[in-house]
Amino acid sequence: MIINGYPCAYQDYGKRIIVFSNASRSHFIIQDIYAEFFRLCILQNNSKEFVIHKISQEYGVAESVVSQDFDRFTASLTRACSPSVLCSNPASAQLVVKDSDIYSLMSQDLVPFSATIEITDTCNLKCIHCYRGHPFHSYWTAATFEQALLQLRQLGTLHLTLTGGEPFTHPDFRVFLKLIKKYGFVLTLQTNATFDF
């Protein structure tokens, strides 16, 4: 998804939303009224006016107060998604948190925040230190992979690591990348970086 012009991935956990900004390479937590703003405005694509009116009516708060909160939310969201967060004090983004804090929250809630999938055991090298010992040639199918992505998304996973063997040897690797993007995961690759993709 794109937030304020920057690519991001998110997962909604009900009481909080965790967003990963590709531009700033940081996580941030959105909760309470900010989570409602995010759902109504960003996810449901409603106008600012609609969101302010709806929240005002729902909580019996003046629209001017909700409007101020909404403006603070959008300013914080813009700063959190922006690459400039890397160059400034992350605390100024208000929403940005340390990765260790995210993992601690997810552990408390028993959420598998990250997952590793070995999509193939095929490799283009024969390293003596490798646990594989001898070559195999099995691959996940695209259908099985998509089912796994759906299940991981439902469990609350946001980060996905692909490994193998060598993941680039998988004949459907590009299909897998499209599926990962479709379901909004943050991707990490473990590769030997010798394969000509």
Regions found by a protein language model. Give the residues of each.
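Conserved alpha-helical substructure of the radical SAM core
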Residues: 58, 72, 76, 90-197
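Acidic, low-complexity/disordered tracts enriched in E/D and polar residues
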Residues: 1-40
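Detector for Asparagine
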Residues: 4, 22, 45-46, 89, ...
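Preference for short coil/turn "hinge" residues that link or interrupt alpha-helices
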Residues: 3, 21-23, 54, 133, ...
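Long, charge-rich, low-complexity alpha-helical segments
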Residues: 26-115
